[in-house]
Amino acid sequence: MAPHVRILSESLANKIAAGEVVERPASVVKELIENALDAGATDIRLEISAGGRRLIRVSDNGHGMSREDALLALERHATSKIRSDQDLETILTLGFRGEALPSIASVSRLRLKSREAGSIEGTEITAEGGTVRSVTACGMAVGTDLTVEQLFFNTPARLKFLRSAETEAAHVGDLMVRMAISRPDVSFSYYHDGRELLRVVPGDLRQRLLKLAARDATLFPVDGETAAARISGYLAPPAAARSTTSAMFTYINGRFVRDKVIQHAIMQAFRPILEKGRYPLVALFIELPAGEVDVNVHPTKHEVRFRRQAQVHDTIQGVLEEVLRDSPWLQRREAPQRPEPARPYTTPPPSSHREGVQHALDRFMAATPVAPPRIYEQPEPYRPPEPPAASEPTSGYFSGLSVIGQFRAAYILCQAEDRLVIIDQHAAYERVRFEQLKAGFATGGIESQRLLLPDTLELSFSEADTVRRYLNILEPLGFELEEFGGQTWRINAVPRIVAEQDHCRLLRDLLAELAEQGSNAHFDQLRDELLARVACHSVVRGSHPLERRQMEELLRAMDRTDFSAHCPHGRPVSHEITLRELEKFFNRP
């Protein structure tokens, strides 16, 4: 016989709700600190014991609660932060559901002490497993002191899934760092088993970041806005990149989030200068009208939903690119103590590349007619990329260097004040060539050169299929291809800049790139990957002697080139050795 439908007891319902909200000690800490911040606290102290299993205590100097409010706070769906359906659309507080405290109380032994301003005494409430055991008056300062003991004492199945005390304490520490970065105007302290692990005093965001996340990094301000969002914060140079996303601190209206749209926008902006598998150190604060973002889509509120997702994505990417494009870390500029006033950044209209590369390409081709490739009959010998024409003399980091000479015909040695600067000429030429190709592609296609004797290339079945599917991408890149029977294709013309290189190998590399990610990649990303391949093949590998004039021309071209600090694959273009480092190596005083 099938079991009857029954209404769950309040105790069991609270335990189930706690399963969504309270995953581990760090989850409890998050909810309690968010409550403290919503209460206007400017000083928050956290103590834990045994990784939070035995004890979690959060005390603050917020506005506190009356006796009645303190009792209501332990009831499910009791909150002071929303009143109506309309309030859900304009949430600006960190908490709002009224689930956290009753959920925590249902799986622990809890003691709540609170006193509001104007009251002569505070209120102390003890609860066990969600049941209130006592309510008494107590003496205390204005604020709230909340203690959680023996977490998961009545749900042993949850308890056994916790990690070691050190691991749980580390999770709490990561959370405290994120919280402290979100509110540099608030002091935070964190103790584990009586040992102080973190203490920060009120200051500005830059100081807070340098103390908690970027001790050895130079920070550069990010500030810009569009009609979709306002973006502010700081970023560190690529040298400070990490192997995980742990140093990507992103906040929406003051709330820490791990959102795929935001992370994708950040990675797209850093893609030209970061090696694969590396993630930037960045702290971004995204300000949106409350009605433009829905934070009520996930129990932990780490995920959000944007009303205008594409515009927010493009705003973040564009504002970051404005900073990264000039490679400010090469200029040795120190970030100001406070970001400058926001400057407008204009986001291009949303493109269709998010819908898949083929659909995006169709619209791109329809909107921008591609001119026929320009044909050159005679192949020309290799020469380094010509710097783009400039109406004014170029000044900047690279052109300010004094050329010493070449090392093994592969590295350019330069001097700048008290620094020796080594330039990887292949990486530098590759970046210049890439930006030239990108500009050419955007204005009608890459120059093509017809081969006097067409090459034939025997392709595999999958390679031949890739050629047929993506011929309309390969042609603007400068290739003229035609079927020659079976799986054989004839190459009649190639990009001019690779005419003297192994263009058959280049074509195979491009086909592999298209086959791997063509249908899944955004069009801009796919285009850049392909152009980076062409740029790499267009530059002579290995040793290549250069005259001083050519080296100086390359340096000037680098200053006129976007993202000049790195090659298109993310490798650094230059490396500095200071005089002090040399003196230290040679044991000089």
UniProtKB/Swiss-Prot annotation:
Coiled coil: none annotated. It comes from the Bacteria. Residues 381-390 have a biased composition (Pro residues). Gene3D superfamilies: 3.30.230.10, Histidine kinase-like ATPase, C-terminal domain (3.30.565.10), MutL, C-terminal domain, dimerisation subdomain (3.30.1540.20), MutL, C-terminal domain, regulatory subdomain (3.30.1370.100). GO terms for biological process: mismatch repair. Disulfide bonds: none annotated. SUPFAM superfamilies: ATPase domain of HSP90 chaperone/DNA topoisomerase II/histidine kinase, DNA mismatch repair protein MutL, Ribosomal protein S5 domain 2-like. Transmembrane segments: none annotated. One of its GO terms (cellular component) is mismatch repair complex. GO terms for molecular function: ATP binding; ATP hydrolysis activity; ATP-dependent DNA damage sensor activity; mismatched DNA binding. This protein is involved in the repair of mismatches in DNA. It is required for dam-dependent methyl-directed DNA mismatch repair. May act as a 'molecular matchmaker', a protein that promotes the formation of a stable complex between two or more DNA-binding proteins in an ATP-dependent manner without itself being part of a final effector complex. Belongs to the DNA mismatch repair MutL/HexB family. PANTHER family: DNA MISMATCH REPAIR PROTEIN MLH, PMS, MUTL (PTHR10073), DNA MISMATCH REPAIR PROTEIN MLH1 (PTHR10073:SF12). This is DNA mismatch repair protein MutL. It comes from Trichlorobacter lovleyi (strain ATCC BAA-1151 / DSM 17278 / SZ). The lineage of its organism: Bacteria, Pseudomonadati, Thermodesulfobacteriota, Desulfuromonadia, Geobacterales.
